[in-house]
């Protein structure tokens, strides 16, 4: 299986202004995730059986693979959605490996002109997979080129301009489009309706992350205790990408400090040093919560107001930080805006434990 990546896009990583470090707990891919490509390729599961977690998704895709192989057809077009870092790209590579085909990887922001996506489509061999990350960000022209490609296996190209313009149809080899998005509701209905499979990836449970940490540590030849793996899993925000990133940083710490293995104490001390607390919250998470409490009385407050007060981009707050804060019950979303929960106040040490239940019922 060949993996081809279409470059030319990406945003600079969010940095912790207090510590001057890349935020270890962001679920977005950081440069270090790309630079450590050799280790990343070793850690990344290659087959569906090696993929840990997402049990229901694996069963659905296993059936799709078996059926497509039996009919000697490409997989149906599919849409994978959910928070970043949960394995959407990895799953597309696994599907390509299981089907014995190539996988071309790109992202919607890189497909600015019609020829960008036309070149990718024409270059696909029979059965190949085209993976488009952030597919909700496709521009209108690129999206409209996909419609006949997905439905009828053809590429409609306009030649000329004005009254002399004409459309030429180019036949395409059968292929599978896999779209990935964190915002499935942002897709247009015509595009969304053309996917035969639409599947959601959920946050991982702690026991699933423990298994992932143990597997990665074994591949990296890094001794780790069960308690050390548990400590990493608890602080990984339900996200494998973050779990593996934390493992690499703790491995650095253990090596420099002369520890042979990663114990609970080593993991906790290292993560405290990197400003990742017991629930995986980092400097920016706490900034968001404390700003809402100090400036807006805990809410309700709108997203743009939070962004202005914290100096963070509103999309970054909504797509990177907010999903986990909602998942663990630290934020509530209401028609009037976001509200900091009593559980979050308790975690920040702002109210006694016995008051937390009562405050959750306040308007």
UniProtKB/Swiss-Prot annotation:
Keywords: ATP-binding, Cytoplasm, DNA damage, DNA recombination, DNA repair, DNA-binding, Hydrolase, Nucleotide-binding. It catalyses: ATP + H2O = ADP + phosphate + H(+). Its main location: cytoplasm. Residues 278-363 are annotated as: Head domain (RuvB-H). SUPFAM superfamilies: P-loop containing nucleoside triphosphate hydrolases, Winged helix' DNA-binding domain. Mg(2+) binds at residue 89. It is found in: Cytoplasm. Belongs to the RuvB family. Has 3 domains, the large (RuvB-L) and small ATPase (RuvB-S) domains and the C-terminal head (RuvB-H) domain. The head domain binds DNA, while the ATPase domains jointly bind ATP, ADP or are empty depending on the state of the subunit in the translocation cycle. During a single DNA translocation step the structure of each domain remains the same, but their relative positions change. This is Holliday junction branch migration complex subunit RuvB. The gene is ruvB.
